Regions:
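Cofactor-centric catalytic regions
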Residues: 2, 10, 15-28, 55, ...
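Helix-loop-helix junctions that connect adjacent transmembrane helices in secondary transporters/permeases
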Residues: 92-183
Length: 223
């Protein structure tokens, strides 16, 4: 750590790659979203996937340190078309510690995070009797909640040695469970506080900003 003010730098080597994975989705346990995440994963899957956590005294020193980090990648054959992902030999999540707690048709060996088929009556028979059958595929554009307050989190260690997470979140107790899974510690060692927030509209129903500061504070015992 050659940059003054840098407190810690973490990579996938600081995270047990064989530990139980977690989901960031704020859903009632057992969550229908698969447990497919690690805080830092050796296997990165897209541009923007985190490869390091840099913690420092201020934003300036962190920005400087980030520019000095060099990362070597082993480039794998990509899977870029989601319509060809099912049962493809290229697996997005090949790891054995991937887990789906709910029977939603998830199977990482088939690139499925969920799958369901349902119908009422003899659908093929009804379609055969129709004069006109229209078969089209529709795609909706991406959307994002535009709340006034953005995602914000800070963490400390309280008097009792617990991890205290103060966050602009809609899911206090889900957040505690998610952080517990991510860090591999008991929920009793975590306290989550939600001050009055400036909007969320569902966007803050996911652990977006809590995991990384929680990890850094638990490791360093510093805010």
């Amino acid at each position: 750590m050659k940059v003054p003010g840098i407190e810690a730098i973490f990579t996938y080597k600081d995270v047990d790659q064989n530990m139980k994975r977690f989901t960031c989705a704020g859903q009632t346990y057992p969550e229908p979203s698969p447990y497919d995440r690690l805080i830092l994963d050796k296997h990165v899957r897209f541009i923007g996937d985190p490869v390091a956590i840099v913690a420092g005294a201020d934003e300036r020193c962190v920005d400087k340190a980030m520019k000095l980090i060099k990362t070597e990648y082993e480039v794998l054959e990509p899977l870029l078309d989601f319509t060809k992902a099912k049962d493809n030999e290229i697996l997005v999540h090949p790891e054995d510690n991937w887990e789906a707690l709910c029977p939603v048709g998830a199977d990482n060996k088939r690139n499925l995070c969920a799958h369901d088929e349902s119908g009422d009556g003899d659908i093929d028979k009804v379609l055969d009797e129709c004069d006109i059958v229209i078969d089209r595929t529709y795609h909706t554009k991406a959307c994002q909640q535009s709340m006034m307050e953005t995602f914000r989190t800070f963490c400390t260690i309280d008097t009792y040695g617990r991890l205290h997470v103060v966050s602009s979140t809609q899911i206090v107790f889900h957040c505690r469970r998610i952080i517990s899974h991510a860090l591999g510690i008991s929920p009793s060692k975590i306290r989550v506080t939600k001050p009055r927030i400036g909007g969320g509209f569902g966007a803050k129903q996911t652990s977006v900003s809590e995991i990384y500061p929680a990890f850094v504070t638990w490791k360093t015992k510093k805010p």
